[in-house]
Amino acid sequence: MQQHELSSSRFVSTLTKNTVALILAGGKGSRLRDLTNWTAKPAVPFGGKFRIIDFPLSNCINSGVRRIGVVTQYKAHTLIQHIQRGWGFLRGEFNEFVELLPAQQRIQEEWYKGTADAVFQNLDILRQTNIEFVLILAGDHVYKMDYGQMLAAHVRNKADMTVACINVPLKEASAFGVMGVDENDRVVDFEEKPAHPSSLPDDPDHALASMGIYVFNAAFLYEQLIRDADDPKSSHDFGHDIIPYLIKKYRVFAHRFTDSCVGAADGNYYWRDVGTVDAYWEANMELTKVVPELNLYDRQWPIWTYQEQLPPAKFVFDNEERRGQATDSLISGGCIVSGANVRNSVLFSDVRVNSYSSIEQSVILPKVDIGRHVTLRRVVVDSGARIPDGMEIGVNLELDRKRFHITEQGVVLVTPDMLGQNLHHIR
């Protein structure tokens, strides 16, 4: 094909129609601490009304990839419920679907042992689709990306595998798979979470990091997964095992996120790994800016989610003693701010903030009830918590440390369990 044909919209559409996406959503996300005690990280709420997994799912839909499998394992009930309620709008008669693929010992009597094994254990389902390409995605990152452009680059390079990548600060690179590439962006070196990562040749302060987004030729992927499954020394992980093996023998290319990111302003791209409480809080706080880097209001690339039927947000009382108001904040449906002041905060659905309370730089998850005369500063409150009248959190961190979790940046995480409120009755 000619170069212009390899980038045409019709060609990209053909590629996306011949692709199945697998979203790996079985991780616990232990660095999010108590936020993932009862749910998998991809199901954690984000941005006022979404869940983290809505971003890769929406990227698939908006890119034209309409055959999607979601691989689940750890405490998947909330995630399964969300997908069943909010992602059933695809048309099966057009061979479109979002299917749940829980760990079910389909091939062997073990649960998913690694990212590659999670795909391997669903190999029979993949083969039945008769597709040309497999797009493998992490289910726990926040970003907007046109996967069609990555698929086109994969075909253009005649690649066996393509790895999406971004530049990250060198001091943070140990948390990622770090790669080295030649002048044609062919991957020549790869190390998963190195203790001493290598910098970019032309930028000593940054490293080239894998985003955990891969494109494979389908038949090639099946061969490699079988080979890896038969290797007793393998940990069955794409970053630790599959990629280091492939770069020695096959055509593995890097795809720069800047070539396919959506809605980037002034050449800046938006991609967030919200894997820690600090990163999660900061990413939510960024959304309260007048012009945030992540545009949730872009009708050309919407973020889809489950639309719960809720009444409008409501603000009541307007006098000197108590005034219901919110500034520089995201307030979701079903919220009532009753004679309280909310600033630079994100309130998810069905939150109640009662009179004389003050909320600043805080993330309040769904169905939280905040009493009267409460003060919250730089706090993340987990779903369903009830904050008693008069409680101050984020004002005296030494006192907070005795009851709650305090992050390195001084953000306070509060959950119902920490408040002695048992929402998960087992006995």
UniProtKB/Swiss-Prot annotation:
GO terms for molecular function: ATP binding; glucose-1-phosphate adenylyltransferase activity. Pathway: Glycan biosynthesis; glycogen biosynthesis. Alpha-D-glucose 1-phosphate binds at Y112, G177, E192, K193, S210. Signal peptide: none annotated. GO terms for biological process: glycogen biosynthetic process. It catalyses: alpha-D-glucose 1-phosphate + ATP + H(+) = ADP-alpha-D-glucose + diphosphate. The keyword Nucleotidyltransferase applies. Disulfide bonds: none annotated. Involved in the biosynthesis of ADP-glucose, a building block required for the elongation reactions to produce glycogen. Catalyzes the reaction between ATP and alpha-D-glucose 1-phosphate (G1P) to produce pyrophosphate and ADP-Glc. Belongs to the bacterial/plant glucose-1-phosphate adenylyltransferase family. Homotetramer. HAMAP family: GlgC (MF_00624). This is Glucose-1-phosphate adenylyltransferase. It comes from Methylobacillus flagellatus (strain ATCC 51484 / DSM 6875 / VKM B-1610 / KT).
